Amino acid sequence: MCSSDLKPANRYCCGLDTCDTGLCGADCGAGVPECGNGIVEYGEECDDGPLGSATCDILCKEIPVLPDVPLNQFNIGDSIGEGEAADGTIGLPNHQAVWSTGYDPTDAVNSLNERFENGNGAAYTENNSSRDIHINQAVSGAVMADFYNQANAVVNAMVNVEPGHADMVSILLGNNDVCADSLETMTDPVAFANQYRDGLDVLAASPLGEDVNLLIAGIPAIYWLWDAKRNDFWCRTFAWPFVPCQNLLAGAADDCSSSESAQDPDNVYPGDGSNCQRRKAFHAKIRDVYNPILRDVLENEYQANGMLTNAEYIDTYDIRFGSVHVNGGDCFHPSKAGQALMATEAYCRSSWSAESASCSP
């Protein structure tokens, strides 16, 4: 039999040796496995050649393959998160058509929920009409101050959705903080930031833990919702007076100095009227004040300190809504086509789309 001092540490067996068969090699005198030679030898789980590859670690142990989709997805938001008026019916929620957790296979929204289900249905617990009451916690009219309560609602509801905890939460809040009666009555930025922290703290401290995937969408360029319907008599006369966003919609007729100016909300042109200038100031506050809070608080205060490392801020401010993207009822909320646009842009700008051919330039 082989001398015991010649046996490698992982105990090969040969001759008359006896040992746990689960730890024994087949050949007496076989060499110690060589990690990185491309041959799966005794004691190795895998060996695809290069050390530290995508399949094997430096010890030739298999690297667990993470699912390319989350285990489930919850939604926090406002009227956009409820799909309000997506079908053109004023005030009616359309949860099935929401950009994040929508579930209607017959529409063209192709929500994040549907993309995850189509990508790996075995790993992902999809939203549907029976689960939506637990998954979609968005409430029409919600402001950032409601983030705390909606986050707690997710924590309380997640036990009802496999695997019993929230693996991903999509968040779009802030639209109703910037939409107000005037520029002066928009939510105070300091309060906005503190309310944002309150919601993040709930998600970070809850049983979701630090590994929860958060997709935090920036406030879209709401200016383009006005622009898309500004020449529509019905919208200007009958719909917009009842929409709670008068710092954008009041004086709905275009008084910009030129069509070039109206199509360039980032700059004030000589001769721009007071309504035009107010709308451009509204646009700038979203760009320069509120969205930077959403980005910087997450990255500089939480992630820089090792918290919520699987969260990501998605900036969709450059998305331009056209007439087809705005419903014809209240002339303000995204239509199903608008929800589809938001779904595509949010998904393709997120880390979940890394291998998606549909997001290729």
Give residue spans per PLM region.
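Cysteine-rich modules of extracellular adhesion/ECM and protease-associated proteins
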Residues: 1-65
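N-terminal secretory targeting modules
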Residues: 36, 46, 59-118, 122-128, ...
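Short amphipathic alpha-helices and their capping/turn segments at secondary-structure boundaries
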Residues: 63-74, 151-164, 200-211
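Structural recognition of the beta-strand scaffold that forms the well-ordered cores
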Residues: 72-84, 133-138, 167-173, 177-179, ...
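Short, solvent-exposed loop/turn and secondary-structure capping segments
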Residues: 83-89, 147-148, 180-185, 226-230, ...
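Conserved SGNH/GDSL esterase-like catalytic core that processes O-acyl groups on lipids
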Residues: 89-195
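A structural motif corresponding to the C-terminal end of an alpha-helix
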Residues: 108-127, 198-215, 275-315
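Catalytic His-Asp segment of secreted/periplasmic serine-dependent ester chemistry enzymes
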Residues: 224-361
